[in-house]
Amino acid sequence: ILKMWAHRYDRTADFIVVEGPKAGGHLGFSNEQLAHMDAINFDGEIRQIIDCKKEYEQRYQKNIPVIVAGGIFDQKDISHALDLGADGVQIASRFVATEECDASEAYKEAYIHASEENIEIIQSPVGMPGRALRNKFIDRVKRAKLPVSKCYNCLEKCSPQKVPYCITKALIDAVRGDVENGLVFCGANTGRIHEITTVHHLMQELAGDLQ
């Protein structure tokens, strides 16, 4: 990506987010890779990316921070990412279970009642695998196509007549509270979340000795 942008536009990145296989939502890995996550040398990939971006930092005389994402749960994970040479981390799932998150209470409750056993990899209508909570909706779309009554034009090449379901409607329904009849994306460590807290307390827990 850096090479392409440098060649075509003489521009480089402001920062790089490296998302690993434990992330929630759509994943940049194949189903086969995700079935053998332990075999993915994610640490090695991070180190290679950090080494690669140095060339472009020198060429453009700017710092390009590397942010690690996907499955970052606690201070131990943050410290590990920083030890690899990353400049920071990106965390999503843990902030869903906060009072400040604008998702419905039912959506947050689905997170804190999740277990490792009911988190699975699904095939999204966009053609990528994704990680989500198993619910009635997931069970239904495994059995049959759900008719699409309205197109939100969110994907250029989406055909409402052919897709198994409308992912936009499924995501909106879930976040608004219909968690059994919508799509609840989540990270691999969501089963470790057991309470709804505040952003302030969560930041204190995550930063702690790192400050």
Short names for language-model regions:
Residues 1-16:
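Short amphipathic alpha-helices and their capping/turn segments at secondary-structure boundaries
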